[in-house]
């Protein structure tokens, strides 16, 4: 369980297990953020050491700590209370705990990666002055770097010599566990910084204002994409624009920190008057329009169920984004053609516009 869940309800289940003399091992992740609802701090400013002492106080037979070596932990304080080990010993330690009768607990201490990025931007968290690159001339595409790190910042790189690996520097959280892979292709560069793209001159041609038809009942808009790419912002901007025009609008957003990198759906309903908005969620086959920021999320069953042939108009970016499955399957390839077909089959090819967007990152 996470530290937020532990704080508001998880402790009660552990107490019940102790009371019933159950043999069970709890793994508690202390990532220093309530990730499900936006990355807030914990009520009462609870710390990892507080959790350890509380577990011991309620009668947990053995508590062990696992920590990320890059965390700024007061190890001397922990060592006087429990045994604490580096994270590479996780499997060994949890197997030992599983053999102990009664309730045991493993407290894993590692700050949430998304929260690290936030704090580094604010200068409140250590930012290593180093970046890791993969030399494609040496890489053989074995995928051991992904096995060791389970990291979505490792991307496939298709070459004339086959599939290699590359590191997406914009999503790398500087965990560096990828270098534990049995591979000589890694290059560590100290002092490297990402290139900042210079603001370009935006030339917008004259566009006549469209004739907007009157809204009958509600206009139902669905926006899909990957968390952390501005999908929630698009929904908020459209909702505010409708509000400023005096229209009624209801928007349902997935804004939790845990959505970063995952599928995000925004439901936005617009009406002539606020009183005409009776429900926020767009129901089965009721979407009038869909803006897709990612092909994989848009072609998912959850999204397709909202679309209807000859009713829904779809505009979707068809750039391929790496999926989490690639960390487990080195040969994984997105079924892009099948995803395009799924969308066009649902609403009709005349109602789909697939576009390609380009972005400079480094």
Whereabouts are the PLM-identified features?
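Short beta-alpha connecting loops at secondary-structure transitions
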Residues: 33-47, 74-82, 124-137, 159-170, ...
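Iron-sulfur cluster-binding cysteine motifs and their immediate structural context
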Residues: 110-111, 116-122, 140-197
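Thiamine diphosphate
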Residues: 1-104
């Amino acid at each position: 369980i996470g530290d937020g869940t532990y704080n508001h309800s998880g402790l009660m289940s552990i107490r019940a297990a102790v009371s019933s003399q159950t043999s069970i091992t709890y793994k508690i992740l202390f990532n220093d953020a309530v990730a499900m609802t936006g990355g807030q701090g914990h009520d009462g400013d609870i710390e990892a050491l507080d959790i350890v002492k509380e577990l011991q106080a309620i009668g947990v037979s053995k508590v062990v700590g696992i920590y990320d070596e890059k965390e700024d932990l007061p190890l001397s304080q922990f060592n006087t209370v429990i045994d604490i080990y580096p994270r590479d010993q996780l499997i060994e330690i949890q197997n030992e705990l599983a053999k102990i009768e009664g309730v045991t607990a493993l407290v894993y201490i590692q700050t949430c990666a998304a929260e690290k990025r936030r704090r580094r931007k604010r200068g409140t968290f250590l930012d290593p002055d180093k970046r890791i690159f993969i030399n494609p001339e040496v890489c053989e595409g074995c995928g051991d770097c992904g096995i060791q790190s389970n990291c979505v910042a490792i991307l496939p790189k298709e070459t004339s010599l086959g599939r290699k690996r590359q590191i997406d520097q914009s999503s790398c959280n500087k965990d560096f566990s990828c270098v534990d892979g049995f591979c000589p292709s890694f290059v560590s560069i100290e002092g490297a910084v990402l290139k900042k793209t210079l603001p370009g001159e935006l030339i917008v041609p004259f566009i006549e204002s469209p004739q907007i038809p009157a809204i009958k009942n509600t206009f139902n808009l669905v926006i899909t994409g990957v968390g952390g790419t501005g999908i929630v912002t698009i929904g908020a901007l459209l909702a505010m624009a409708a509000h400023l025009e005096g229209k009624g609008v209801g928007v349902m957003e997935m804004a939790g920190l845990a959505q970063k990198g995952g599928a995000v759906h925004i439901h936005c309903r617009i009406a002539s008057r606020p009183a005409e908005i009776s429900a926020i969620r767009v129901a089965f086959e009721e979407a009038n329009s869909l803006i897709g920021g990612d092909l994989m999320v848009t072609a998912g069953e959850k999204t397709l169920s909202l679309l209807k042939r000859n009713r829904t108009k779809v505009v979707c970016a068809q750039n391929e984004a790496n999926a989490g499955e690639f960390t487990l399957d080195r040969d994984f390839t997105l079924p892009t053609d099948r995803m395009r077909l799924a969308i066009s089959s649902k609403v009709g090819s005349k109602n789909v516009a697939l576009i390609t967007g380009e972005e400079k990152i480094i």
